[in-house]
């Protein structure tokens, strides 16, 4: 492929970049309505979504949570520092929490963020490593903010590597940071059109996770939690099995994949939501496009709805693009304009000729901050 072709080709991806970040924010904002709910009837979900069409509600009526707040910190750090800078990213996390603590942060991560705020802290990974008696967190907090890594790095290896490092700032258990890698890889593959072949998409993710779960630390953590030796691979195989069935109930999805705050119980679930909603489904309006179906279905699962919808929205948005997202949904959610701006900045740098000629430097893209 010529250099000119490599420069022109990414132009078609602008919509996908924007869709990924905006879809993430929408899932977070819209999903907050049902967070923690055990039973979420589909008609309640559809009623909630139809209310977004009401022009009298005003802009920013649905607030974003810590999911979006921390995702923005990741994006800003990558854009500003040119590479993954753990200290810069950690400081942004701490500053964001201090500025706006009422975003629904969990008690565990709050302890970490307060320690990260200390000017005397030498190792920014240490507070997370000290969590839960040294076992670290296996929650989905690293995965919920992983989208910018999928946009900032070209190679799959770098997406995998740096999304894990970014998650380790708050989640030092391999179940936590490997979940972040899985989410980032799913968005990365979706950006490249891999969802056109759903089974190949899953197979690629399984292959990636097999490499990560061969690690001795991952094996140790899985054993300590009484899980299978390759927990994410096992869940992804369950996703494939569910996809092969002619009929799947919400109860079965929750039983097989989960809907909780653990990364293992939510990242594969988000991936399933996207795959399941590639085609129209009973109970969902025919007028809904794929992204709308994905978010609606994510909410109907209950549990950690804002984060599951956030992750599913990012993967779906990277596939369908910004034009698939209803404008009424966008203006009803806080932080959409900022997410769109971050996506455009990442995209603009992605298209720079000098960047395309220097594909092997393993650095994320950045802006000039002068």
UniProtKB/Swiss-Prot annotation:
InterPro entries: ADP-ribosylglycohydrolase, Ribosyl_crysJ1, Ribosyl_crysJ1_sf
GO aspect biological process, one term: DNA repair
Keyword check for Metal-binding: yes
UniProt catalytic activity: [(1''->2')-ADP-alpha-D-ribose](n) + H2O = [(1''->2')-ADP-alpha-D-ribose](n-1) + ADP-D-ribose; 1''-O-acetyl-ADP-alpha-D-ribose + H2O = ADP-D-ribose + acetate + H(+); O-(ADP-D-ribosyl)-L-seryl-[protein] + H2O = ADP-D-ribose + L-seryl-[protein]; alpha-NAD(+) + H2O = ADP-D-ribose + nicotinamide + H(+)
GO terms, molecular function: ADP-ribosylserine hydrolase activity; hydrolase activity, hydrolyzing O-glycosyl compounds; magnesium ion binding; O-acetyl-ADP-ribose deacetylase activity; poly(ADP-ribose) glycohydrolase activity
Signal peptide (from-to): none
One of the record's GO cellular component terms: nucleus
Assigned protein family: Belongs to the ADP-ribosylglycohydrolase family.
Name of this chain's protein: ADP-ribosylhydrolase ARH3
Provenance organism: Danio rerio (Zebrafish)
């Amino acid at each position: 492929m010529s250099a000119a072709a490599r420069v022109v080709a990414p132009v078609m991806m602008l919509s996908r970049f924007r869709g990924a970040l905006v879809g993430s924010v929408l899932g977070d904002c819209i999903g907050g309505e049902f967070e923690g709910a055990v039973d979420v009837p589909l008609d309640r979900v559809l009623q909630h979504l139809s209310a977004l069409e009401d022009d009298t509600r005003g802009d920013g009526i649905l607030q974003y949570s810590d999911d979006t707040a921390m995702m923005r910190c990741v994006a800003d750090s990558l854009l500003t520092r040119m590479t993954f800078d753990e200290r810069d990213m950690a400081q942004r996390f701490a500053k964001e929490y201090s500025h706006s603590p009422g975003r629904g942060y969990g008690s565990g991560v709050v302890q970490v963020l307060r320690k990260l705020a200390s000017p005397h802290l030498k190792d920014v990974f240490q507070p997370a490593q000290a969590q839960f008696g040294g076992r670290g967190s296996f929650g989905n907090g690293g995965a919920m903010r992983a989208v910018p890594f999928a946009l900032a790095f070209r190679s799959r290896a770098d997406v995998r590597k740096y999304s894990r490092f970014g998650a380790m700032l708050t989640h030092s258990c391999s179940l936590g940071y490997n979940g972040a890698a899985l989410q980032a890889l799913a968005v990365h593959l979706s950006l490249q059109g891999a969802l056109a072949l759903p089974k190949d998409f899953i197979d690629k993710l399984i292959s990636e996770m097999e490499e990560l779960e061969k690690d001795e630390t991952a094996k140790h953590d899985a054993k300590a939690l009484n899980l299978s030796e390759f927990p994410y691979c096992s869940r992804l195989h369950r996703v494939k099995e569910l996809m092969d069935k002619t009929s799947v109930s919400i109860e079965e999805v929750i039983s097989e994949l989960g809907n909780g705050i653990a990364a293992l119980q939510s990242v594969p679930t988000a991936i399933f939501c996207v795959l399941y909603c590639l085609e129209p489904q009973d109970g969902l309006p025919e007028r809904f496009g794929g992204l709308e179906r994905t978010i609606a279905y994510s909410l109907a699962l209950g549990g950690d709805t804002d984060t599951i919808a956030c992750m599913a929205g990012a993967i779906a948005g990277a596939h369908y693009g910004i034009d698939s997202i209803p404008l009424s949904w966008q203006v009803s959610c806080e932080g959409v304009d900022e997410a769109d701006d971050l996506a455009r900045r990442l995209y603009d740098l992605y298209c720079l000729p000098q960047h395309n000629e220097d594909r092997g430097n393993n650095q994320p893209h950045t802006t000039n901050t002068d």
